[in-house]
Amino acid sequence: TITCDVCKIYNEQGREAVVNLIKEDVINSVHHIESLTGCKFNDPENPQLVSVRSGAPVSMPGMMDTVLNLGINDEVAATLAKKSGNERFAWDSYRRFVQMYGDVVLGMKPQNKTDIDPFEEIIESVKAQKGVKFDTELDVEDLKLLVKLFKEAVKKSTGKDFPVNAWDQLWGAIYAVFDSWNNERAILYRQMNQIPESYGTAVNVQAMVYGNMGNSSATGVCFSRDAGTGENLFNGEYLINAQGEDVVAGVRTPQQIMTEGSRRWAKLQGISEEERKAKYPSLEETMPECAAQLVEIQARLEEHYRDMQDMEFTIQDGKLWLLQTRN
């Protein structure tokens, strides 16, 4: 974690001052991650990918930027495919990274609702040519094509080739998270919620876990209580074979974590119990052990923080990982 104090220095003195201050610590911390995982950052033979996410001292949901799968390039994608035995997962992770990095770090994200997202435009075009509706229906060759077209879009927009060195990617993402403290959405959110501008944001660099490795993997968000009423009712949503913001992006219909919530949702949607179980089963039904772990974890976290918790999680090959929690 790079602390909020560094963000203040970044805002006051700029990038060079921050690099001089924290470069050695960042390198040592990445080596610490490597010692825990047994993988190597910026090594195509045994690659360690990371996520870079913000950590504001006061919760600002959806306002700050995150980059996943950082450290990937053509060689790393080939290694991931070989090691995992899942070529589609490797290239899906790669196309997601180029899209996120282009949006967050290289400034290609649409600034308002009328702007066209160049990456989404490319995805929709490829899906239309293939005659499919969902991203999950694209095969390996389609995903390789997306990576190629995304990189061409980056070159056209920025005039530069997409960065392939993991350290260059990492520093770009660190700067972008600090910059996101002063993006229009974040400034407006702080004004509306009386959050001091001086707080700044931390940057969290985490080892990646993957919710997009297949049907035994998933990603989701959950709340220890009903966010609308405060009722003591654990609830949340998840998607099989997904990653990052897929759950809230509206591309696929997310499923409920608890069976009770799933039945309630189906009733509101006019979906029969038979169809619900076949098409939209709860996590409790598809991965009961992970659901039980989540129930236990949310209770422990709420007791510790003495407040309702908003959590993000990933399931990789049937193993649950909690990514973050906030009050």
Where are these regions (language model features)?
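Nucleotide/phosphate-binding sheet-loop regions of phosphoryl- and nucleotidyl-transfer enzymes
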Residues: 1-327
